[in-house]
């Protein structure tokens, strides 16, 4: 029988496969794609997903090893600078690996402890964890739409 940690890690890994599959389809020319006057490009959203995964590992899971300058969160808008596909892929991969390692380190009792963040208040770690899963899925869906219908 799997532990809570193993089950939650499986859920996260399966949900994140949608992002990986989408990334496999992205070309350098896609990074600037937006829909009409929408504020975010594919490049920005990829950087944002990785920024937030790293912030999550640092602030929600309390990892002292993670160092992150979350430019997309700081700037709060697409500055047009996220145009290097290889660099974005590395950053997304590194963020995913960091978060995966942190999830795997959790003890069974950790999932029921309460944490508090400015973004979503007081939640159990398991409830907070659902936020990163849904955040990644939400923006991955946006990326898919931008890739299919967007214009640079």
Language model features with spans:
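Short, contiguous alpha-helical
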Residues: 5, 9-13, 20, 28-74, ...
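Acidic/histidine-rich alpha-helical segments that form the ligand environment
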Residues: 77-113, 127-132
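Generic structural signal for secondary-structure transition and capping sites
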Residues: 17, 28-31, 54, 97, ...
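Basic/polar N-terminal segments that are highly enriched at the extreme N-terminus
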Residues: 1-3
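Hydrophobic alpha-helical core bundles mediating ligand binding, dimerization, or RNAP-core interactions
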Residues: 12, 16, 23, 92, ...
């Amino acid at each position: 029988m799997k532990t809570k940690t193993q089950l939650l890690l499986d859920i996260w890994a399966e949900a994140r496969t949608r992002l990986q599959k989408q990334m496999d389809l992205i070309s350098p020319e896609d990074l600037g794609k937006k829909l009409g006057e929408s504020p975010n490009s594919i490049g920005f959203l990829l950087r944002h997903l990785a920024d937030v995964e790293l912030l999550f590992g640092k602030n929600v899971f309390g990892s002292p090893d993670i160092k992150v300058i979350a430019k997309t969160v700081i700037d709060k808008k697409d500055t047009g600078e996220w145009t290097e596909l290889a660099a974005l892929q590395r950053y997304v991969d590194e963020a995913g690996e960091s978060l995966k390692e942190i999830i795997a380190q959790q003890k069974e009792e950790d999932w029921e402890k309460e944490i508090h963040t400015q973004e979503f208040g007081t939640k159990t770690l398991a409830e907070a964890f659902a936020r990163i899963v849904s955040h990644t899925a939400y923006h991955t869906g946006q990326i898919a739409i931008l890739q299919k219908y967007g214009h640079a």
